[in-house]
Structure formats: structure tokens, C-alpha cells
Design a protein with these regions (language model features):
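Short acidic-glycine-tyrosine-enriched beta hairpin
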Residues: 69-85
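Short histidine-centered beta-strand/loop micro-motifs
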Residues: 21-23, 43-49, 91-93
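Short, conserved beta-strand element in jelly-roll/cupin
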Residues: 33-37, 48-66, 103
């Protein structure tokens, strides 16, 4: 199939994760949504072994991005880019659920931006 369309609620899940990459059958980059209830977090980690850059986009809620041990409150609409070596976690200390879109790709993927971008 040359394209695939899926609503977030129809994506395959694993715990708090919406597995967008798997649902859309992507091979060039990773893209998933983590939905964190109040008081939850994702495990602290880095992406050094896979040499992956990550972009976080806060879709809803007000989680805290903890980057190298430093707290960065992030309201809905916030973007963050992380080099592979940075330790990271997402903590939802607020009263409302938080949803964060995470996009990742190896730095060696060969991506070349268009001139206008």
C-alpha cells in the first residue's frame, strides 16, 4: 500500500504507548505517542547505542522533560530536540494526563533537508 491512514485511538498499544511507527509500517524513522496518566513517567534513558536524535512534541497536558537531570516544564505545544547522548525522561507531575509525540531517527539516516526548510 502506498499510504496508510490511522487515528491515534486505532494505533497498536503497549502499556502507555501508541505504536504509531508499527501501525503505519514505517521503516525510515520512529514515531510513537506516550500517554502518561498523572504521577507517571517513562524510564530514564539515552539513545547513544542507537545514535538516535529525538524530537518531543507535547500534545496535551504539562509534563516535565528531565534532560540530564535538569527539569524543563513543557506546556502543550512545546517542542524539544535531544542529541543521542542526553539522558532523558518525561514526568507527568500534573493532575491531568499528558500526551507526548516522540519522533526519532539515527543521525546517520542520510536525511537532507529541502532548501526552503
Amino acid at each position: 500500500m502506498s499510504f496508510k491512514l490511522a487515528h491515534r485511538d486505532a494505533c497498536e498499544t503497549a502499556g502507555n504507548w501508541r505504536l504509531v511507527r508499527r501501525t503505519l509500517e514505517l521503516g525510515a524513522f520512529g514515531i510513537n505517542v506516550v500517554e502518561l496518566p498523572a504521577g507517571e513517567r517513562i524510564p530514564e534513558h539515552d539513545e547513544t547505542a542507537r545514535d538516535q536524535e529525538e524530537v518531543f512534541y507535547v500534545m496535551s497536558g504539562s509534563p516535565t522533560l528531565v534532560i540530564d537531570g535538569e527539569d524543563h516544564p513543557a506546556a502543550a505545544g512545546t517542542f524539544a530536540r535531544l542529541d543521542p547522548t542526553h539522558s532523558r525522561t518525561i514526568v507527568n507531575g500534573g493532575p491531568e494526563p499528558a500526551s507526548v509525540l516522540i519522533i526519532s531517527a539515527p543521525r546517520s539516516s542520510g536525511y537532507e533537508p529541502m532548501d526552503w526548510a
